[in-house]
Curated annotation (Swiss-Prot):
This is Amino acid--[acyl-carrier-protein] ligase 1. It comes from Bradyrhizobium diazoefficiens (strain JCM 10833 / BCRC 13528 / IAM 13628 / NBRC 14792 / USDA 110). Its cofactor is Zn(2+). Zn(2+) binds at residues 131, 176, 279. Its EC number is 6.2.1.n2. It comes from the Bacteria. It catalyses: an L-alpha-amino acid + holo-[ACP] + ATP = an L-alpha-aminoacyl-[ACP] + AMP + diphosphate. One of its GO terms (biological process) is tRNA aminoacylation for protein translation. InterPro entries: aa-tRNA-synt_IIb, aa-tRNA-synth_II/BPL/LPL. Binds 1 Zn(2+) ion per subunit. One of its GO terms (molecular function) is aminoacyl-tRNA ligase activity. Belongs to the class-II aminoacyl-tRNA synthetase family. Amino acid--[acyl-carrier-protein] ligase subfamily.
Amino acid sequence: MNIAVLPNSPDTAPQIADPLDHLADKLFHSMGSDGVYARTALYESIVERLAALITSHREAGTEALRFPPVMSRAQLEKSGYLKSFPNLLGCVCGLHGTEREINAAVSRFDAGGDWTTSLSPADLVLSPAACYPVYPIAASRGPLPKGGLRFDVAADCFRREPSKHLDRLQSFRMREYVCIGTPDDVSDFRERWMVRAQAIARDLGLTFRVDYASDPFFGRVGQMKAVSQKQQQLKFELLIPLRSEEQPTACMSFNYHREHFGTTWGIQDANGEPAHTGCVAFGMDRLAVAMFHTHGTDLSAWPAKVRDILGLQPHVAAGAHGEGWR
């Protein structure tokens, strides 16, 4: 009789090393959950310098806004996020009952029971992308001026995608430039930024390619949305081969939403038509990981051109972990 040889269980199977694992000890500290890490001074110094570099390319007339890591649940629901990415959403919950009900939940916890059954959702969600809060703000200002509006936005974001890979965090930073205007306004904006972003990546010494892409829409209907998005070339990504050419990591994206947000929020362009929107998004943590993977964790050994662009000057006594570089 033939006996099937079963593979190792997940608990006993050997863990396959990831090409980015060698960076973990220098850049992060575990916080008990995959994709959520404390970040070292070495790592943050590069994130901050990348942010400054992106700021230096900001177009004139662009309004800067910085958002907290949470946003209105009602606004995100209205934006249509639940129809496209319900599996990625993180909601804020709390103990909202009476004093007696809250004490009962605490008592269950003390007794080893499940206190979370008493949780109920708040009016907040964790922001899944930096640009969502800007559209109702723009809508509150009335019809757009000729040429539209441009925003520079940033936020700490969250998507429920637990992973041990350092380029797929659950909690991450996103920086975006957003354009709201006519179709021509948005098309020209995206073309400018696709050229500009590739120049930034080249200056940083990164190997990359740009290709059309789709968002990770949920379910079978989502698969059809993804096909349509690619066919219409509504999304492009700047891909860096951190693991391989076949499985590159998207570190920037260039998105055209058409009139979706204009119609949703009642934003009218200068011609009285529903405004079109687009954005260029920089995954700040993915870019930082790409820099360390490409150039190493010794900042003094980075190419001179890259050090100059980022403003990295050697301190008289550089620390062992690169903290002497400012």
